[in-house]
């Protein structure tokens, strides 16, 4: 049975090689367990790190797929993305075979609920001390549904270099 994984995490986080390596490792571990479909929304912060990892792993595991739920408005203008962020975004969208895009105009809460409903696993970057956030709401929904949650914030805090 093919299984699915979603990604939730804070928009602001330290992007380090340690985090990127841990994301790659966890995604590859899930692929070995039969996960083939990965779901992300928004492509900001954590989502972009995870999406890039899926795209890179497609070179080794061409059967996996990234499903993106992107907002209908232009994030480049809204958030004032720098050239690195724009390059990451364009790199992800350039994989025409491995990326499926659905445009989303609903609320973030409804999107997060949809991602949870589609998934069996959740790889997240979630600081439990930040309780009033969209990430905390999404993790609560994932816990309620019984998703296997892999929180890399905890791992990063324990093993960062």
Placement of each model-derived feature along the sequence:
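Acidic/glycine-enriched connector segments
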Residues: 1-161
């Amino acid at each position: 049975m093919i299984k699915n994984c979603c990604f939730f995490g804070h928009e602001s986080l330290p992007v380090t090689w340690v985090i990127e390596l841990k994301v790659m490792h966890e995604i590859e571990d899930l692929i070995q367990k039969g996960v083939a479909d990965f779901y992300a929304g928004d492509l900001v912060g954590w989502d972009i790190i995870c999406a890039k990892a899926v795209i890179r792993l497609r070179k080794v595991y061409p059967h996996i797929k990234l499903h993106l739920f992107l907002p209908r408005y232009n994030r480049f203008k809204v958030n004032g993305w720098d050239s690195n962020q724009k390059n990451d975004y364009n790199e992800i969208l350039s994989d025409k075979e491995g990326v499926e895009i659905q445009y989303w105009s609903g609320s973030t809460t409804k999107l997060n609920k949809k991602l949870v409903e589609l998934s069996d696993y959740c790889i997240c970057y979630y600081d439990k001390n930040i309780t009033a956030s969209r990430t905390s709401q999404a993790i609560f929904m994932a816990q309620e549904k019984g998703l296997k949650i892999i929180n890399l914030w905890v791992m990063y805090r324990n093993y960062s270099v």
